[in-house]
Structure formats: C-alpha cells, structure tokens
C-alpha cells in the first residue's frame, strides 16, 4: 500500500525521489517524506496529507545530496501526521528507514528499547527499526542490517540509510514488493515499477529473505546470512507512456478507453490463427492434466473476486468442473477441503495482494496445484504459483480497476474454453461460436463509448443520492457486484448489489420513491424473471436504469432509462456490459468533485493484512 523509492548516483536525489513518489500516488497514501544524505548528516522532510504539502516543505527548506530514500505512507500504526510520516530516524539521526508492511513484534521490541533508554517520537512500528539499528550498530552497516532483520517478525519492505556509510543504501523484503532498478552510474529502489520506468527498464526483482546493497556503480545481493546470490536481470516491457495520462483528465478514464487494446492483447496470443480454438502456450496442458482436476478453487479480493464469481459460471458451464470462489482473506479461516486434485486459481491485478498471496501459500501447503492470473510479470504471486497466465493490460494506475478486470474476465473465459475442449465437455461448434463473438469485443467497445453522452446525462439522477441499488441474475449478478463496487469506491455513494430473486427476501423494504436502481438484464435465459424484478421496484416508484443488449424490445417498456450494449454471446456480454457501469461511476464521481484516481481511504495494491 505504501510507496517506496530510493536513489544513489550523481544527480540530486530529491528530484528523483519527488518524481518517483508522484508516480506512486495511485497506491494510496496519507503522508509522505524523503531523507537525503549531505555533508555528514541525513536531512529529513516529511508532511501529512498530499504530496504537494511535502513539495512545499522541500521548496521552503531544500535538501541537497545524491543519496536518498522516500516514502508515501498509508496509516496502520498511528494516525496520519507529520511525526508518524516516514522516513523515521533514530535519536541521533544516524539511520533513516522507510518501510511498507507490519512489524508484528514491534511492541515487544519497543519495550526492550524503552528499558535501554531510547525515546520514541511517533506511534509507528517502523520507528522501532531505526532505534534497533542504532542499538545493534557494530561499526558495519551491512552487518547491522542483517542483525536487525533477524529480530523482526511480520511482513515488510525495508530500505535503510546510514550516515556512516553514505555510499550505499540497503534494502530487504518479506511478503511485500520491492525492486532494484539498474542504471548507468546510478541505481534505484522502488516498491513498484512506475516509479523508475522513465529511468531504467533493467531491474532486480527482490525475493523474500534477500538483502540488496545498492551503490551507485554496483548492486550486491545476498541472503540473510551474507551468502552472495546471483540475480537475473528482469527487463520491464511496459511502455513508459502507458503509465502517463496521455491527454485524459484522469488515469481511470484513460484506462477505460484502453480496454479494446488490452482485451485484444490479452486474447490474441491465445487464439489460433484460424480463430477456432484456444491454446495457452504458457500452460500447455494435456487432457490428462484437466481430467485430473477434481475441483477448482478461485480466490481473490475486491474486483478480482468479482471476476472469479463470473469465472465460476464460465468454468462450470463450459468445462463442467465444480468451482468454489473464496474471498482470499477468508479462505485460510474455514479449513477448506483442498488436496492434490484441487486447482487453486488466484486472481490479482498487482500480483502483490497480501491476502491472495497468503491464500495461495495455504492452498499449496494443502497440496493444491496453483495457477495465477495477474497483470504484473515477476510479481510475488506470479513467482509463488506453479503456473501463470498473464493479463496483458499494461500499467493500471487508477485505484479503481477497469481494464485489469475486463482482461481477467477474458483470460478466465479463454481458460474455461481451453479446459472444456481438453476434457471433452465443450463442442467444437460452441467453442467457435463463443470465440467468434469474443474476437469482436475490441470493436464492440466503441459501441459503448458512442453512448457516453447518454451515460453522462444520467448523472443528475444519481449524484445527490445516498443509496443506489444494482440488481441482476445469473452472470449479471456478478456484474452488479462489480458495478456497485465501482460506484461506491469513487463516488462515495452507498451502493449495494443484489441477486434479482433476493429482492423479496428483505431488500424491497429499502426501495422507495426516487431511489435509483440499475437493473442488469443482458442474460437472455433469465430476462423474463428480471423484468418481474424490475416491475417490483417500479411499483415502489424507484428510478430504474436498464442495461440490455441491442435488439432487446422488452426491458425498455418497464424502465425509466436504458443503456444498450452491442449484442453478443451470453458468456461474452458481461465483459462488454461492465464498461457503461465504469463510465457511469466515473462521471458521477467527477460531477461530485471527487479525486477519481485516488479515492479516499483506498489503495491500489493492498499489501498489508
């Protein structure tokens, strides 16, 4: 959740640090700070609030030097304040630390240090690490860091500076992402790729239990005992311009409009040239591989969880394999029936979602095979899973996921077709029909974009409301859940989703005159029942917006407003029908004056439990 940057070289460190932190704003934060070494001392500037507050502090009191670290903080221990912001130092200012994660035994360590006479300024767990460095310093910076790490329990990405050895920065990680960027006469540290993408594409992806000693001309990597580790250079293939707004007002809007390309890139390498079959070269499964699967367990969080709910329909209907879908943070606590015949599919945009990573490790511990669906090559989840199928969405910067979600659905639908053909449960004709419609998706997205004025026109009916309800049946129910999440996370309007058939089991008591209801009715087999549900809420004077396929003639008779999406196969239409809901959420949030890319209290990548 927090953002970390580090620099050592010949340029002014503060310039890089501020630029890198700006590129990590999407991760979510409530305070920010930098520390720069110069002339025998470490100068620290930190401020609560947005990065502009830190920029003003640095402008008022410049920091000069070519070695430094920076941080955007998301409060876990201690509220947002200047004093709780990172970097943290020991009392003498000999060490400076930035940290992402949670030190679980910090109270135990703090009590030990208090007894020795150390004084603490902040409420954070991180300050303990700075004092521990001072307490354990043995005249050798690297040796001290190793000893400090041996005392810590929990999850962390940690970056250390020491004024006694300003020619190096040291970093290490456990269960939180960290990369080292390799430059010419300068090197970089970051928690995520966008921070360094305009400076270098060559990186070391740090693994748990590794320590990197980063100097301006060299990077040495060892294990916790000091044994050298040979690291392979990972070259980032992202387009640097893809991590910029490119003329759009917000990253979210840009990423909505990037979906045609993202969808095309994700499926083009997995559909045969004749367009009739699916093949995952990276999996290369055999019929025996698929037939040995007793059940599939999908685990994910947030938007990725909603993709998993739709995947349950895809897989069970097309491949006839039973599927369970778990919220990752709950999976470990229900003693799941997982064994060697279970395929665990984990879905995560960032590949760093801590709860999903923990669920993956637990499933593997119980003997399950594992497959990751993620957007980030080299991420923790991609390295932990047995196999990986990447969504080629490119960088997604906005907190509210859009193109990552649609490419997850595309990947999961293709995977369902792949398994169904291999185990003999899917006919050639059915596969060809779905693929024919799927390959039309990039062009059909334009049909949704053409309705943007209609979607904008609906904002007045929503922007001042306290509640919005989304209803749907079958695959539309999973879609309703994602639509409600999009609206609530960026507009701050309370939004809930319900299966259409559940209205009469309690939800109807909340429907009254003028309450907006978005009724998803794209699934042909349940349309009649959805119309009955729409009539139920209309009878209570709700304001109903229907979402239907083009050519539908029935739903429009019962709703107040209609959004039409190009007609497609029932398995494909959910991928298309989410786009108007993304646009609606976006324009409602904009009309309310909200910071769409960085909604309050939320982070892009949730890396603490």
Predicted segments, located by residue:
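Conserved short alpha-helical segments that host acidic/polar catalytic motifs at enzyme active sites
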Residues: 1-250, 261-294, 333, 428, ...
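Hydrophobic alpha-helical scaffolding
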Residues: 7-10, 99, 119, 135-138, ...
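Glycine-rich oxoanion-binding loops at beta->alpha junctions
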Residues: 70-83, 274-287, 311-347, 494-510
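Generic C-terminus detector
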Residues: 252, 543, 556-558, 564, ...
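Active-site phosphate/pyrophosphate-binding segments
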Residues: 259-263, 267-297, 377, 387-516, ...
């Amino acid at each position: 959740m927090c953002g970390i940057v580090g620099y050592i070289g010949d340029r002014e460190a503060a310039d890089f640090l501020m630029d890198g932190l700006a590129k990590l704003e999407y991760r979510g934060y409530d305070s920010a700070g930098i520390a720069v070494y110069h002339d025998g001392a470490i100068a620290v500037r930190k401020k609560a609030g947005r990065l502009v507050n830190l920029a003003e502090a640095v402008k008022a009191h410049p920091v000069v030097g070519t070695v430094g670290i920076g941080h955007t903080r998301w409060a876990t221990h201690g509220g947002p304040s200047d004093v709780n912001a990172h970097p943290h130092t020991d009392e003498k200012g000999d060490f400076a630390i930035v940290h992402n994660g949670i030190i679980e035994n910090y109270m135990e360590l703090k009590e030990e240090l208090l007894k020795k006479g150390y004084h603490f300024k902040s409420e954070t767990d991180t300050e303990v690490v700075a004092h521990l460095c001072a307490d354990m310093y043995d005249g050798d910076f690297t040796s001290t860091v190793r000893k400090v790490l041996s005392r810590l329990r929990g999850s962390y990405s940690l970056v250390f500076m020491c004024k006694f050895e300003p020619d190096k920065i040291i970093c290490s990680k456990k269960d939180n992402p960290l990369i080292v960027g390799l430059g010419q006469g300068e090197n970089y540290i970051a928690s995520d790729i966008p921070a360094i993408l305009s400076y270098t594409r060559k990186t070391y992806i740090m693994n748990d239990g590794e320590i990197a000693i980063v100097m301006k001309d060299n990077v040495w990597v060892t294990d916790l005992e000091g044994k050298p580790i040979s690291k392979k250079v990972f070259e980032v293939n992202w387009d640097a311009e893809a991590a910029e707004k490119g003329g759009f007002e917000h990253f979210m809007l840009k990423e909505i409009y990037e979906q045609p390309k993202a969808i095309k890139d994700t499926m083009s390498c997995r559909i045969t040239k004749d367009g009739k079959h699916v093949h995952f070269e990276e999996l290369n499964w055999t019929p025996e591989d698929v037939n040995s699967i007793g059940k599939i367990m999908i685990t994910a969080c947030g938007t990725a969880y909603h993709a998993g709910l739709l995947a349950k329909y895809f897989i069970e209907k097309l491949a006839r394999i039973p599927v369970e879908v778990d919220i990752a943070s709950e999976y470990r606590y229900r003693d799941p029936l997982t064994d060697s015949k279970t395929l665990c599919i984990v879905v995560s945009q960032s590949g760093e979602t801590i709860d999903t990573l923990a669920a993956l490790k637990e499933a593997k511990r119980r003997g399950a095979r594992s497959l990751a669906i993620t957007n980030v090559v080299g991420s923790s989840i991609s390295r932990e899973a047995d196999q990986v199928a990447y969504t080629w969405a490119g960088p997604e910067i906005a907190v509210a996921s859009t193109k990552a979600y649609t490419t997850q659905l595309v990947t999961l639908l293709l995977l369902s077709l792949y398994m169904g053909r291999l185990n003999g449960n899917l006919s050639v004709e059915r596969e060809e029909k779905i693929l024919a419609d799927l390959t039309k998706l990039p062009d059909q997205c334009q049909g949704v974009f053409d309705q943007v004025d209609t979607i904008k026109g609906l904002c007045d009916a929503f922007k001042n409301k306290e509640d919005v309800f989304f209803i749907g049946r079958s695959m539309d129910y999973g879609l309703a859940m994602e639509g409600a999440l999009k609206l609530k996370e960026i507009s701050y309007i309370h939004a809930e989703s319900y299966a259409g058939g559940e209205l009469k089991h309690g939800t109807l008591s909340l429907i009254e005159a003028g309450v907006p209801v978005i009724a998803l009715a794209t699934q042909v087999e349940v349309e009649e029942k959805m119309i009955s549900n729409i009539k139920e809420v209309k009878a209570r004077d709700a304001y109903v917006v229907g979402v239907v396929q083009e050519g539908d003639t029935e739903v429009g008779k019962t709703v107040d407003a209609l959004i039409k999406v190009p007609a497609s196969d029932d398995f494909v239409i959910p991928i298309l029908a989410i786009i108007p809901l993304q646009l609606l959420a976006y324009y409602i949030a904009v009309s309310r004056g909200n910071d769409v890319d960085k909604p309050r209290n939320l982070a892009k990548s949730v890396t603490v439990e």
